[in-house]
Amino acid sequence: MTRSLKKNPFVANNFLGKIEKLNMREEKEIIITWSRASTIIPTMIGHTIAIHNGKDHLPIYITDRMVGHKLGEFAPTLTFKGHARNDNRSRR
């Protein structure tokens, strides 16, 4: 279900404050965040954000095509290591 258009997109307050401070100073540095539910807004374009995937922080460079998506979409939490082999010896 999508978010109502009457509401603004969700962005964590402390995370939004960090972005605004960097934009005022016109600096680019990596911002570490655990807020995977935050929506990418146009003020974030050009920043590198390290998004937590449950184990590490993955640095993601924000581009204009990412606006409107959630931060968590770009930091996968699961690593697929393949299906189990069909080992007939273990069945005996």
Swiss-Prot record:
<keyword id="KW-0150">Chloroplast</keyword>
<dbReference type="InterPro" id="IPR005732">
    <property type="entry name" value="Ribosomal_uS19_bac-type"/>
</dbReference>
<dbReference type="InterPro" id="IPR002222">
    <property type="entry name" value="Ribosomal_uS19"/>
</dbReference>
<keyword id="KW-0934">Plastid</keyword>
<keyword id="KW-0694">RNA-binding</keyword>
<dbReference type="InterPro" id="IPR023575">
    <property type="entry name" value="Ribosomal_uS19_SF"/>
</dbReference>
<comment type="similarity">
    <text>Belongs to the universal ribosomal protein uS19 family.</text>
</comment>
<dbReference type="GO" id="GO:0009507">
    <property type="term" value="C:chloroplast"/>
</dbReference>
<dbReference type="InterPro" id="IPR020934">
    <property type="entry name" value="Ribosomal_uS19_CS"/>
</dbReference>
<comment type="function">
    <text>Protein S19 forms a complex with S13 that binds strongly to the 16S ribosomal RNA.</text>
</comment>
<protein>
    <recommendedName>
        <fullName>Small ribosomal subunit protein uS19c</fullName>
    </recommendedName>
</protein>
<dbReference type="GO" id="GO:0019843">
    <property type="term" value="F:rRNA binding"/>
</dbReference>
<keyword id="KW-0689">Ribosomal protein</keyword>
<keyword id="KW-0699">rRNA-binding</keyword>
<dbReference type="GO" id="GO:0003735">
    <property type="term" value="F:structural constituent of ribosome"/>
</dbReference>
<dbReference type="GO" id="GO:0000028">
    <property type="term" value="P:ribosomal small subunit assembly"/>
</dbReference>
<dbReference type="Pfam" id="PF00203">
    <property type="entry name" value="Ribosomal_S19"/>
</dbReference>
<dbReference type="GO" id="GO:0006412">
    <property type="term" value="P:translation"/>
</dbReference>
<dbReference type="GO" id="GO:0005763">
    <property type="term" value="C:mitochondrial small ribosomal subunit"/>
</dbReference>
<keyword id="KW-0687">Ribonucleoprotein</keyword>
